[in-house]
Amino acid sequence: MDLNRKHKVSLRGASSGEISRDALLAKVSQERELRSYARRANAASLFIQRVWRSYIVRKKAAIEIQEEWENLLSCHSVTLTKSWVSSRVLRPFLFFVRSLSVQHQKIQAREIHCMQTCFKILLESINSNDQGYNFCSLAVGTSEDSKTWACQTRRMVSLCSFLLTECNYSQERIKDVIGVNALLLRILIVLTDPKSWKIITNENFEDAETAKKIIIQFIGSCKSGYYSAVRRYIKTLTKHTDERLVITTSAVTLALRPFHVKQPAFVDDNQPDTNLAVEEYVSLILTIPRLVCYLPSALIRALKHKSILMPSFHTILLLKDKILNIISEMENSEKQSCTMEIPSVGWVIGNIISLATVSETDFMDPQESNPEMFYVLYVHVIVTLAENLLSQVESVGIQDIHLDIEATSNETEKGNSVKISFVEMLRPVCQQWHLAKLLAASGKEIRVIADKDASTSSKKGSETLGLLDIARLYSCMLRIFCVMNPVLGPLPVLNMLSFCPGYIVSLWNSLESVLLPENGCTADDASHGSAKTSWNTRSPSEKKLKHLKNDSVNKWVNVLNKFSGKSPGPREHVECTSDQPGSGQVNESTNDVWDVETLRGGPVGISKEVSCLLHLFCATYAHLLVVLDDIQFYEKQVPFMLEKQQRIASMLNTLVYYGLLRGTGPESRQLMDSAIRCLHLLYERDCRHPFCASALWLSPGRTSRPPIAFAARTHEVLPTSDVLTTPSMGSVITITPHVFPFEERVHVFREFISKDKASRKMAGEVDAPGARSIEIVVRRGHVVEDGFQQLNSIGSRLKSSIHVSFVNESGLPEAGLDYGGLSKEFLTDITKAAFATEYGLFSQTPTSDRLLVPSPSARHLENGIQMIEFLGRIVGKALYEGILLDYSFSHVFIQKLLGRYSFIDELSGLDPELYRNLMYVKHYDGDLKELCLDFTVTEEFCGKMSIIELKPGGKDTSVTNENKMQYIHAMADYKLNRQIVPFSNAFYRGLTDLISPAWLKLFNAHEFNQLLSGGNHDIDVDDLRRNTKYTGGYSDSSRTIKIFWEVMKGFEPSERCLLLKFVTSCSRAPLLGFKYLQPTFIIHKVSCDTSLWAAIGGQDVERLPSASTCYNTLKLPTYKRASTMREKLLYAITSNAGFELS
């Protein structure tokens, strides 16, 4: 560089070819990455070349060795020895087979031929009596020979695993592959059984056993891959076939070899290889779907043997987390993509139940040593696995597992088929003998040889089989059947539990000893015995739980005696009959406190064990309540006396109320569902035929009920999906409205309607008479037809105001203006005409109260179903406007409207004669074939008889003693459901156009009738007077008005009802008093000329009083004497005279 050179500065600016600093740095970075990539690519290419060269060299060497091997065996003339078999036959064979077939995962025809040759030589050597030639001699020879033998045998196990995976129907040379695999399995079975070795002696037997254990431990390890291969092989079997019988039997026999090594009582950390074999078996073999279906009967007997099941049970219990993790990882690795796939842990449950309970006699023969220990482990294993399965499927549902949004209907059908086959494996649990054997083993002390490091809880859980353990098992089964059984749900389990003799009584006795006070639920007990019965902690007292477990044996003695038909002993007899009805009546003391203190924390406040027991009881008893008739429930009082029914109802009422009030987690959902169902069934039975004090249902909410407006708001806001999980008063009023007094619920109903009217008014809808109201013209003689034609199509718009114009019989418009009163008259007239039996839409029940029920002949009338739907809207309009209609519906019909269950005994109010006949059939002691009944019912319409089958082929099915219950429920179902449902659905559609279904469900059937037609109590004259208006010159102080109220008080209750009907067209008072009568009760003055002496004996007014029912107006002349007013009023209200607007 020239230092003397003068530095020049360019003033021309930056050149377009120059780049910025950031761009230069980015360019340099990119070049650096390119160089790094080039280095990595070069290294990768060198590695690939190295691997390829290695592969080519090994393949070439393997081919050369194979050719030499084939030439050697084709012309060998040397004397065969064990060393020659090992070094010249087996060693090169294992090398080239591994290089040419195993690593390629494909078997060539040439290799199959080599395998056949090698295995035949090896089998010949093994069967030889010559120690110099027998391959097994190496196992008991020198240390070097035994190591060689073990190494080569392990490689044959690996080769066997490979061959098993290739035994699928897609293999071209499947028969040849099966043949060589059968040979190899036969060799391995001999090699793992030293007793079958021809060279075995007393001196070398220990060495042979040691060598055998080495191989068996390798088979049970993950390195061998044997259990994975057996799993893949069995899953390829579509069914059991004779051609694969040998290979299937041999493969499973070899897989069971590790179980026949001397086992400790529990899993032993000192024998990890043996433990691994059991883990592999549980996680890979027992998870095979429908395992039992693929195996021959001989193998099933082997798999269900105690020596196989017991170690499996121990491993699952003590290594639960590890086993479940292995199963989960296996599922992920297999990448199951089938829609609705059953989780693998579910198949473990199914396979264990199928193996342990192949038949009643096979469910652990009592002659086996320590059978109670087997039952303990069996129950704990099923519960452990079931809880894991339920945690996977209950949160999202089985249909959402591995969800494929493009799943077709065929995949859906396949998923249902898989679930049905899975449920079929659980069928033994639904048999009474299964429960009987578990109960027989419950409570017995069991001697357990436990590992000294085992946890205390594990030891304790395995010492006895208690009632709670069995309850947990069946509670889990109920939940599994709910999710997995697409057809019947939990019905198979519930049928068995419900009709098991004495089982439900024993469940309740166990619960009662823990949850309820011992001396009843009285106020004294609640105040003075709180220390004794309080439940301030999450779990029940240890003393009660211990007492429950210790007494479980005694409580099950009666159950087992009923199973076996044995007569109970004296003490047992006392316990068995202690729950029979006595002569005492139901205690109706108003001082009873039915709020159970121990359940005020809801499901969260009780232990998991008791919660499980409670869930099982609720589900089972709810199922039983469906079929219990009134004779059994009220007269015979089975399974419980009415006093205990009260305690059950109070317990459920408290549990559900506080569970909804405080909120519950997903883990309590099943308990709450079953408790709610059981509570509703008891409450509905009590509504129909009371057996509980009214205070019982109100008790939980007596101190915590919110204001009416608040309850209404929370009821409306709460989403349906959050009813059970979100703590709120809205949940309480939605699920258990009966804890609120009826009057308060009516207030809530009115609040709902007021809010709806306000929202409609804000939306611009018409809510009062005016120019924009709906206008209709109705002929007096055709009220129903004209109303149907003009109003049927407007749907929910019927909430708006209706302007009615009547046309008289002469065809002329009637005088007067409609300011709302004519709408009431229209509703009254249309219901009077449509509900008349002569019209044909409704008929009256044959009972004394003459309740309305849809007539079966209505379906044959023109527009019959549409007319009933229209009448639903008319009734909804009356409820919406607060107009009382003097009609009441059958409870069966209302139950359908409210979406509630109808008991078979409700048939007595619908068709008493049919009910008596069905009860006669139910309790008939002779042969029912003598009655010549079949599954049909005969209906008559217009003189024509038609026969309807109660089930397919019913006319050819005779009623017998075996199917009489099916016949009774089929007949009841026809009368209570099939015959009524089309009409109730139509009426419901119309009714809910105006009244929300949620509003209706605040009431029971009896209360619905009261809401529609008013209370059935006597009229409160003072309340009516306070809410009466006077027009035309009358006032409350007028002489005639004072006389009227004196006469009104002097009437009989029936006469007061007639007067009310004369004025309002309804004989009953509004539910919450005359304040809510619409329109308001009015007395209008009708001036009449009378003598001044009329008040003391002269001529009084002769004119009769009249009324305008459309305005609830009584037109009362100015009578001077009480006797005259009484006479004229009675004549008017009993004459049934017609009238027009005046």
From Swiss-Prot:
Q: Please list the reactions this protein catalyses.
A: S-ubiquitinyl-[E2 ubiquitin-conjugating enzyme]-L-cysteine + [acceptor protein]-L-lysine = [E2 ubiquitin-conjugating enzyme]-L-cysteine + N(6)-ubiquitinyl-[acceptor protein]-L-lysine
| UniProt-listed InterPro entries | E3A/B/C-like, HECT_dom, Hect_E3_ubiquitin_ligase
Instruction: List the active-site residues.
Output: C1110
First-level EC class: transferase
GO molecular function, a single term: ubiquitin protein ligase activity
Keywords linked to the UniProt accession: Transferase, Ubl conjugation pathway
Biological process annotations from GO: protein polyubiquitination
Q: Which Gene3D superfamilies does UniProt cross-reference here?
A: Hect, E3 ligase catalytic domain, Hect, E3 ligase catalytic domains
- Region span, Disordered: 567-589
Biological pathway: Protein modification; protein ubiquitination
Q: Where is the composition biased (Polar residues)?
A: 577-589
In this chain the IQ domain maps to 41-70
Identify the Pfam families for this entry. Answer: HECT
According to its UniProt record, the EC number is: 2.3.2.26
HECT domain: residues covered: 794-1142
General function of this protein: Probable E3 ubiquitin-protein ligase which mediates ubiquitination and subsequent proteasomal degradation of target proteins.
Spell out the family assignment given in the record's similarity comment. Answer: Belongs to the UPL family.
Q: What is this protein called?
A: E3 ubiquitin-protein ligase UPL7
